[in-house]
């Protein structure tokens, strides 16, 4: 029987959707609908397990799953022994302290003596210790935001994305305790065969991630301006330059970061560039 790498991902929610999208962008085809709990890829040695996010670190650490995509906050909180292969850049959030809006809060020192409700006692405990704060931790498994309103705690420490949940419960965000995003984690005891499959998967993931927020740009430029334009468009190594049928003109092809595009565009126009086309990129293999 051929070796198969077993991947654990969250069975529902935003992290699940992003994880499935990433794997499928790597050219790996598998079934992911209809309440599926296990799916074998059709064209890659990969089996996907759909689990509760809190269970993923344990499955990976115990070797039931070889690798897992999980929130960094969950991985750190569970204290399970896993190797972090790479951060994935999605499902970003933060674990923050929230206090009642009316409370006067002057800084971390204001937390001294407080009762703080949280579902992340380990991460919060580390934060309090590192900042020499003396506060008590009240662990609860859900609906953390309600704790100050019912007298269960003075403050909370919980996951924040937009902050709207805090506001709707009469709280304000004060201190960021931990910043998190999705990570790919692996069992430390992978066999050589499974490491080889993981290396191939990582090669594909890197190609997909390298292309994110990057655009392919094509433009026409007078030959006398090629050096100026080339300096603006470094590309992966350097821009591709091809002469056009019209004498004195060339076509340049390059890669630019989307965040830099508008600033570069103005400079390209100033240098005499015309017919600028911008296209999305699916993969970049370096």
UniProtKB/Swiss-Prot annotation:
| Compartments reported by the entry | Cytoplasm
Return the EC number.
2.4.2.17
Cofactors that this protein relies on: Mg(2+)
Its annotated pathway reads: Amino-acid biosynthesis; L-histidine biosynthesis; L-histidine from 5-phospho-alpha-D-ribose 1-diphosphate: step 1/9
Which biological processes are named by the entry's GO terms? L-histidine biosynthetic process
Which GO CC annotations does the UniProt entry carry?
cytoplasm
Using the UniProt record, name the top-level EC class of this enzyme in a single word. transferase
Alphabetic keyword roster: Amino-acid biosynthesis, ATP-binding, Cytoplasm, Glycosyltransferase, Histidine biosynthesis, Magnesium, Metal-binding, Nucleotide-binding, Transferase
Q: Name one GO molecular function term.
A: ATP binding
| Gene3D superfamilies hit by this protein | 3.30.70.120, Periplasmic binding protein-like II
Q: Which domain of life is it from?
A: Bacteria
Query: How might one describe the regulation of this protein's activity?
Result: Feedback inhibited by histidine.
Q: What is its main location?
A: cytoplasm
**Keyword Amino-acid biosynthesis on entry:** yes
Does the record carry Ribonucleoprotein as a key word?
no
User: Catalytic activity annotated for this protein?
Assistant: 1-(5-phospho-beta-D-ribosyl)-ATP + diphosphate = 5-phospho-alpha-D-ribose 1-diphosphate + ATP
Cited InterPro entries: ATP-PRT_HisG_long (IPR020621), ATP_PRibTrfase_cat (IPR013820), ATP_PRibTrfase_CS (IPR018198), ATP_PRibTrfase_HisG (IPR001348), HisG_C (IPR013115), N-reg_PII-like_a/b (IPR011322), N-reg_PII/ATP_PRibTrfase_C (IPR015867)
Give the protein's function.
Catalyzes the condensation of ATP and 5-phosphoribose 1-diphosphate to form N'-(5'-phosphoribosyl)-ATP (PR-ATP). Has a crucial role in the pathway because the rate of histidine biosynthesis seems to be controlled primarily by regulation of HisG enzymatic activity.
Q: Which NCBIfam families match?
A: hisG (TIGR00070), HisG_C-term (TIGR03455)
Q: Which family does it belong to?
A: Belongs to the ATP phosphoribosyltransferase family. Long subfamily.
- Protein name from the UniProt record: ATP phosphoribosyltransferase
Protein's gene:
hisG
